[in-house]
């Protein structure tokens, strides 16, 4: 939002310097991006009247002029401007003047003729282009000898504000003046709205066919206007200093009203309309040539203004060329409407262009402003272009309901940390136009029609805080005792998990929760993932249900950078659909190991990590829980090198080697090892129990069993452990043999059994019966003792 300080002062009676106003606005939340004067620095330029013009005797393109610059006599100046003529008033720089760029004016001779100064164009003064080839011609009543900076108010300050989306009420001079009044306590002078005399007979019927999209639409016909009328200099100046180029009087009036009070407007050529105006959704196949000469194909989610023949304009965005006013226009229709922000939002991006109107409508326009805007525009049209105004025609759809919000003074003090008197709070609310009503606890406020962001108590507290001034709230450092919170014995701290993974050689990574849909199909066999309505990009179209895809992508990035050993882990949320259709999110820890077990070094042989290496890492991570590894099939994993991690009969994760088919698809030289576990299961742990260390030596027995290949080592261990008693401290596999001496389809598995008593030294009489029992259990399960 760009505006001039001089225009602001017509509605806010403030005498603050521009620097102080800049600071005040920024501190209140209306960030000032830029503040600069209306013209660059120059001095010594006055208004002069050209009294005579004669051709230069020695130059075809030069003229010798005599001008009255208020010095008491005529000054001779040689001028080459094509539009110089007697009787005009122009800026004149006399000897001693300094123009932009530190260009100093001195008496000189041009082709033998004395020139005591220079007549100036807008370009030479650093002013906006007035579209004239030559001198900048001033109004006839411009006082001769007056400093041009004073006459044109060139020391005026131009502010550019960065208005946040929730403060659409500040996208006008009226809104900013209201804000300045609240911040400084100065008088707020609202623009005077005069009811136009009804002297015309024509009306423009209006029908709202989409009441949820258009809450109000007002039209007024003005007949017999002069479309060729010139926009007054004062209006041109205010528009230009607000960053809007003057086009024509009728268009300029619409833009002026929008900037002045905040209501976007549109002007139709009444003679180009057919029947009633309809505010409706676009229909399939409809197109529109817009004012920017761009023809667009309309979608059915677009609100349009149409007549009986077709679409006239994109509602709230841009008018159509077919119904636009021109120099030949005689009768016009003024339009002022309230469109729901939701129907306008996103249309600028959809059609590839925006406007000042759409910028305001998509943020929210005051829904009680339309009649005032029509009256103000009518007044200006009659004043500048003449004509006869007809009656207003209004159609109404669904308008927002004013919300009531309570403000508790105790809550205000708690949040802001300062006790603001109730009288001051009431004054601030009144200056903001919020019309407070006193209650037992504080105030009740009905959100005004121009404030869409006042919905809850916190919004009112924010308003009080920024107007009171956050810099005025004293620093008050609160003190409090730090209470040590005891962590339950059955839960390990989160940082311990991070430390454990780092100690095992893993590096933490963070990947996107938005992933490629193909990853979900490949690594989770998820044919129906949670899809995003507005994805950032095609490769971020769905929410992940597994961490494996992100870890594989990180591996690819590292391999592309010549890293041949990668150990990474991530703790993050995954997302899935519950049985009731609701979205479920769970936290998981995922890990990936690729390459050698240890970094390459001279003292030992290098080998690549295998399933048992990463299984050991998982066991270490879950060392405080009783877990089993059960062979499984998983879409991401090798069919023979994958296992589910089971605890208390519940699957809490999986571990294994990436499936061979994904190696080729994702261009991986060798298979990485991966795991993924529910984080809640990792953080849970059993109680640590004290166990006395036996002072008696253990006894070891080695048993070799011949068993079918189909029988797993784990099956054998489960049988042996089931037959063991309290003397058995450990049963584990230490060797596997296949080959000569064994029948086909059989293998030999060697198991060590460690026995130890806590009270006595074990004897053969105690050991041998137990070993026999273990052998018997194994034999019954299909494994015989190897002889």
Curated annotation (Swiss-Prot):
Residues 400-475 form the B5 domain. Binds 2 magnesium ions per tetramer. Keywords: Aminoacyl-tRNA synthetase, ATP-binding, Cytoplasm, Ligase, Magnesium, Metal-binding, Nucleotide-binding, Protein biosynthesis, RNA-binding, tRNA-binding. Mg(2+) binds at residues 453, 459, 462-463. Its cofactor is Mg(2+). Residues 694-786 form the FDX-ACB domain. Residues 39-149 form the tRNA-binding domain. It comes from the Bacteria. Tetramer of two alpha and two beta subunits. HAMAP family: Phe_tRNA_synth_beta1. Belongs to the phenylalanyl-tRNA synthetase beta subunit family. Type 1 subfamily. This is Phenylalanine--tRNA ligase beta subunit.
């Amino acid at each position: 939002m760009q505006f001039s300080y001089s225009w602001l002062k017509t509605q806010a009676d403030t005498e603050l310097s521009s620097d102080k106003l800049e600071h005040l606005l920024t501190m209140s939340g209306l960030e000032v991006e830029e503040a600069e004067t209306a013209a660059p620095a120059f001095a010594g330029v006055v208004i002069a009247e050209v009294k005579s013009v004669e051709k230069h005797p020695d130059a075809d393109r030069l003229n010798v002029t005599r001008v009255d610059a208020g010095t008491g006599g005529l000054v001779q100046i040689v001028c080459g401007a094509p539009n110089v003529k007697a009787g005009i008033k122009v800026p004149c720089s006399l000897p001693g003047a300094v123009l932009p760029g530190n260009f100093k004016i001195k008496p000189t001779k041009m082709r033998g003729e004395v020139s005591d100064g220079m007549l100036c164009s807008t370009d030479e003064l650093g002013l906006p282009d007035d579209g004239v080839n030559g001198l900048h011609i001033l109004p006839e009543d411009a006082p001769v000898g007056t400093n041009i900076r004073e006459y044109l108010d060139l020391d005026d300050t131009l502010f550019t504000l960065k208005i946040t989306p929730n403060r659409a009420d500040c996208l006008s001079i009226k809104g900013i003046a209201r804000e300045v009044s609240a911040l400084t306590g100065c008088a707020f002078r609202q623009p005077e709205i005069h009811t136009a005399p009804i002297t015309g007979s024509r009306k423009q019927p209006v029908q709202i066919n989409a009441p949820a999209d258009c809450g109000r639409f007002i039209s007024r016909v003005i007949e017999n206007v002069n479309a060729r009328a010139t926009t007054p200099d004062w209006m041109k100046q205010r528009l230009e200093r607000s960053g809007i180029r003057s086009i024509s009087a009728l268009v300029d009036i619409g833009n002026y009203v929008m900037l002045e009070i905040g209501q976007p407007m549109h002007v139709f050529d009444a003679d180009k309309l057919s029947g009633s105006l309809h505010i409706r959704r676009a229909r399939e196949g409809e197109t529109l040539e817009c004012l920017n000469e761009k023809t667009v194909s309309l979608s059915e989610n677009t609100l349009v203004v149409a007549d009986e023949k077709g679409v006239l304009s994109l509602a709230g965005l841009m008018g159509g060329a077919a119904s636009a006013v021109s120099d030949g226009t005689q009768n016009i229709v003024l339009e002022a409407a309230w469109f729901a922000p939701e129907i306008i939002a996103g249309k600028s991006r959809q059609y590839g262009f925006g406007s000042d109107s759409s910028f305001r409508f998509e943020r929210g326009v005051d829904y009680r402003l339309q009649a005032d805007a029509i009256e103000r525009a009518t007044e200006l049209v009659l004043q500048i272009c003449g004509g006869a105004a007809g009656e207003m025609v209004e159609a109404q759809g669904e308008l927002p309901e004013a919300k009531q919000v309570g403000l508790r003074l105790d809550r205000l003090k708690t949040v802001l940390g300062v006790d603001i008197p109730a009288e001051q709070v009431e004054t601030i609310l009144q200056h903001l136009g919020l019309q407070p009503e006193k209650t037992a606890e504080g105030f009740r406020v009905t959100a005004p029609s121009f404030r869409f962001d006042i919905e809850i108590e916190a919004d009112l507290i924010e308003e009080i805080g920024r107007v009171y001034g956050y810099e005025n709230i004293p620093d008050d450092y609160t003190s409090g005792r730090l209470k040590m919170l005891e962590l339950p014995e059955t839960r390990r701290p989160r940082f311990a998990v991070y430390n454990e993974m780092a100690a095992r050689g893993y590096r933490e990574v963070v990947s996107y929760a938005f992933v490629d849909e193909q990853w979900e199909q490949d690594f989770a066999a998820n044919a129906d993932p949670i899809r995003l309505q507005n994805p950032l990009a095609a490769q971020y179209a769905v929410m992940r249900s597994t961490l494996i895809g992100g870890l594989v992508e990180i591996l690819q990035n590292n391999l592309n950078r010549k890293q041949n050993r990668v150990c990474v882990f991530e703790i993050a949320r995954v997302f899935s659909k519950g049985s009731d259709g609701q979205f479920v999110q769970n936290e998981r820890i995922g890990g990936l190991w690729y390459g050698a077990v240890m970094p390459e070094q001279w003292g030992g042989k290098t080998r690549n990590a295998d399933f048992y290496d990463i299984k050991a890492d998982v066991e270490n991570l879950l060392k405080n829980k009783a877990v089993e590894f059960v062979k499984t099939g998983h879409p991401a994993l090798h069919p023979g090198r994958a296992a589910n991690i089971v605890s208390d009969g519940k699957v809490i994760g999986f571990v294994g080697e990436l499936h061979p088919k994904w190696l080729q698809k994702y261009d991986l030289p060798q298979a990485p090892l991966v795991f993924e576990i529910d984080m809640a299961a990792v953080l849970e742990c059993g109680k640590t129990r004290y166990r006395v260390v036996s002072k008696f030596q253990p006894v070891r027995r080695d048993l070799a069993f011949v068993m079918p290949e189909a029988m797993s080592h784990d099956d054998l261990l489960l049988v042996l452990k089931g037959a063991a008693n309290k003397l058995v401290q450990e049963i584990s596999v230490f060797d596997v043999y296949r080959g000569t001496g064994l029948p086909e389809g059989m293998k030999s598995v060697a198991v060590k059994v460690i026995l130890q008593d806590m009270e006595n030294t074990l004897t053969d009489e105690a050991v041998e019966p137990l070993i026999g029992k273990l052998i018997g259990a194994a034999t019954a399960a299909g494994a015989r003792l190897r002889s």
